[in-house]
């Protein structure tokens, strides 16, 4: 009987620990996401504390592949408040992403095609690890954005009309 109780607790703690810490909604508007990959991030201690507190901005972020490694640029992680200025990290430093070699090579071949880029979509906790979702996206033109917005608006209207009846 105690095993069943422990099993319930572990399921609850796993569900609680898999939570989204930051999301890049702007990337989904600017890019048509073709594929997404989950990767780890190489972080410093104060960066981990800041991310867990929700002090991260993914909006201007992008990823590059240099010398076979995946690098995250322009993601702002605010300095941790309770650490002294000497021990804190640089907010916009380049961070290495941890992914399998096959995934990196596959992404590199796709990025070399015209018009594709790697953008961070969200940062989340997976157990005690901080992970990031990287999206392979193709930039949208202005008319594509307008068309997408019209489609979403019509879906909202239909949904609200069905809710009334």
Curated annotation (Swiss-Prot):
Gene3D superfamilies: 2.40.280.10. One of its GO terms (cellular component) is cytosol. CDD domains: SmpB. Residues 141-165 are annotated as: Disordered. It is found in: Cytoplasm. It comes from the Bacteria. Transmembrane segments: none annotated. Residues 144-159 have a biased composition (Basic and acidic residues). Keywords: Cytoplasm, RNA-binding. One of its GO terms (molecular function) is RNA binding. One of its GO terms (biological process) is trans-translation. Its main location: cytoplasm. InterPro entries: SmpB, SsrA-bd_prot, SsrA-bd_prot_CS. Belongs to the SmpB family. Required for rescue of stalled ribosomes mediated by trans-translation. Binds to transfer-messenger RNA (tmRNA), required for stable association of tmRNA with ribosomes. tmRNA and SmpB together mimic tRNA shape, replacing the anticodon stem-loop with SmpB. tmRNA is encoded by the ssrA gene; the 2 termini fold to resemble tRNA(Ala) and it encodes a 'tag peptide', a short internal open reading frame. During trans-translation Ala-aminoacylated tmRNA acts like a tRNA, entering the A-site of stalled ribosomes, displacing the stalled mRNA. This is SsrA-binding protein. It comes from Prochlorococcus marinus (strain SARG / CCMP1375 / SS120).
């Amino acid at each position: 009987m105690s095993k069943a109780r422990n099993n319930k607790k572990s399921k609850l703690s796993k569900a609680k620990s898999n939570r989204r810490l930051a999301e890049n909604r702007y990337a989904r508007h600017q890019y048509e996401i073709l594929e997404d990959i989950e990767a780890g991030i190489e972080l410093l201690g104060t960066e981990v504390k800041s991310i867990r507190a929700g002090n991260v901005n993914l909006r201007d972020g992008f990823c590059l592949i240099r010398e076979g490694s995946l690098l995250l640029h322009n993601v702002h992680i605010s300095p941790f408040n309770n650490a002294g200025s000497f021990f804190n990290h640089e907010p916009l430093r380049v961070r290495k992403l941890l992914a399998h070699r096959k995934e990196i090579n596959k992404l590199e071949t796709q990025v070399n095609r015209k018009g594709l880029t790697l953008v961070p979509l969200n940062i989340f906790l997976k157990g005690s690890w901080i992970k990031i979702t990287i999206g392979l996206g193709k930039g949208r033109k202005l008319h594509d954005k307008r068309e997408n917005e019209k489609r979403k608006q019509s879906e909202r209207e239909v949904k609200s009309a069905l809710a009334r009846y």
